[in-house]
């Protein structure tokens, strides 16, 4: 899930890992992780020998999208809210966007309209298959945390990178 962008065809959301292999289901390029922790393409060129180098390339791609005003997360979400640090209360569906101006979360019932500028936080709490519910992006402040479970698959890693890069670009 961290390697969401194919190093060969540059498409996003088609990378799937299983065991020691990761494969792009768009172009078919497949890599295997060897006993030394290096990636090896099963056919053709190995673009990145090490996972951190691939991840750094993804970060640079996101940064370029932001600079060129092409970055946008736009997805429907299930919304969980934590206000008392005791439990997360699932409150319904909504829509989450993230761009150069930060996050905007709106519930479909109109009860929630939260925005968070890029300067609110350097990092983003995001996790994969969180408590077996699903991938999660968490935004909020000291008063309330919003746990957003995106309907779109494979957006969490890119969103985390984008939040970090937006913070750096806007400070």
Which sequence ranges carry the predicted segments?
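Anionic N-terminal interaction surfaces
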Residues: 39-96
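Short, solvent-exposed coil/turn linker segments
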Residues: 14, 32, 38, 50, ...
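Generic recognition of long tandem-repeat/solenoid scaffolds
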Residues: 22-25, 105, 136-140
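Cys/His-rich short segments
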Residues: 1-45
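Short, surface-exposed beta-strand/loop "edge" segments at domain boundaries and coil↔beta transitions
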Residues: 30, 87-89, 107-114, 141-155
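Phosphoinositide-binding peripheral membrane targeting modules
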Residues: 72, 81-134
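Acidic, Ser/Thr- and proline-rich intrinsically disordered linker/docking segments
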Residues: 118-171
């Amino acid at each position: 899930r961290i390697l969401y962008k194919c190093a060969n065809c540059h498409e996003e959301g088609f990378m799937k890992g299983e065991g020691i292999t990761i494969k792009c289901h768009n172009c078919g390029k497949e890599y295997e992780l060897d006993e030394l922790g290096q990636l090896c393409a099963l056919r053709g060129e190995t673009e990145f020998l090490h996972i951190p180098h691939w991840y750094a390339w993804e970060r640079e791609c996101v940064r370029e999208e932001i600079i060129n005003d092409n970055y946008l997360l736009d997805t429907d979400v299930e919304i969980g809210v934590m206000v008392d640090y005791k439990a997360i209360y699932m409150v319904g569906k909504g829509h989450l966007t993230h761009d150069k101006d930060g996050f905007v979360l709106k519930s479909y019932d109109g009860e929630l309209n939260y925005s968070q500028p890029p300067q609110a936080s350097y990092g983003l709490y995001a996790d994969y298959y969180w408590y077996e519910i699903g991938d999660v992006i968490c935004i909020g402040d000291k008063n309330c945390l919003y746990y957003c479970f995106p309907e779109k698959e494979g957006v969490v890693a890119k969103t985390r990178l984008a939040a970090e890069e937006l913070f750096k670009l806007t400070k």
